[in-house]
Swiss-Prot record:
Source organism of this protein record: Thermus thermophilus (strain ATCC BAA-163 / DSM 7039 / HB27)
Transmembrane segments: none
Family statement drawn from the similarity comment of this UniProt entry: Belongs to the universal ribosomal protein uL5 family.
Name the UniProt record assigns to this protein: Large ribosomal subunit protein uL5
Subunit structure: Part of the 50S ribosomal subunit; part of the 5S rRNA/L5/L18/L25 subcomplex. Contacts the 5S rRNA and the P site tRNA. Forms a bridge to the 30S subunit in the 70S ribosome.
UniProt entry tagged with the keyword Iron-sulfur: no
GO terms of molecular function: rRNA binding; structural constituent of ribosome; tRNA binding
GO biological process, one term: translation
């Protein structure tokens, strides 16, 4: 039996028809849709201690349900004591059902757990219909308990859409339930 992905169902049953009405698309393939969600964690301190990378990878795998890929330094920078090829971060690309599961968890559980949360910044679109947000700590996700955490690590989340303008992307994400600041 397939998973019941409420957010995915909402997209097909409510959001897509509303976007067609609002922007007057001729074809359903013109309607903006979510392509992927990329979660990135920069771990500069991992160059001194490999255990930091392992612990962060374990936490990110719990949050996303997928093993993260290690990102490595493209070139050496002596001021940062960095050599080409050193592991300096983690990245996970979520598509299809895992993407919908992650977004549902982000919107319904994680974001409401942020202290003093007043909404997402509506200016964080990149001009090409993609949205980026940064989180300061991994504790807001239900899979991470306080006892597991050795250090607070933030992450960047990029929501990649097929929208061609920020206006279309914002309409898509608002209809999906992203809580933007007014």
């Amino acid at each position: 039996m397939p998973l019941d992905l409420a957010l995915k169902r909402k997209y097909y049953e409510e959001v897509r028809p509303e976007l067609i009405r609002r922007f007057g698309y001729q074809n359903v393939w013109e309607v903006p849709r979510l392509e992927k969600v990329v979660i990135n964690q920069g771990l500069g301190e991992a160059k001194e201690d490999a255990r930091i990378l392992e612990k962060a990878a374990q936490e990110l795998a719990l949050i996303t349900g997928q093993k993260p890929a290690v990102t490595r330094a493209k070139k050496s920078i002596s001021n940062f004591k960095l050599r080409k090829g050193m592991p300096i971060g983690l990245r996970v690309t979520l598509r299809r059902d895992r993407m919908w599961i992650f977004l549902e968890k982000l919107l319904n559980v994680a974001l409401p757990r942020i202290r003093d949360f007043r909404g997402l910044n509506p200016n964080s679109f990149d001009g090409r219909g993609n949205y980026n947000l940064g989180l300061r700590e991994q504790l807001i996700f239900p899979e991470i308990t306080y006892d597991m955490v050795d250090a607070l690590r933030g992450m960047d989340i990029a929501v990649v859409t097929t929208a061609e303008t920020d206006e279309e992307a914002r309409a898509l994400l608002e209809l999906l339930g992203f809580p933007f600041r007014k």
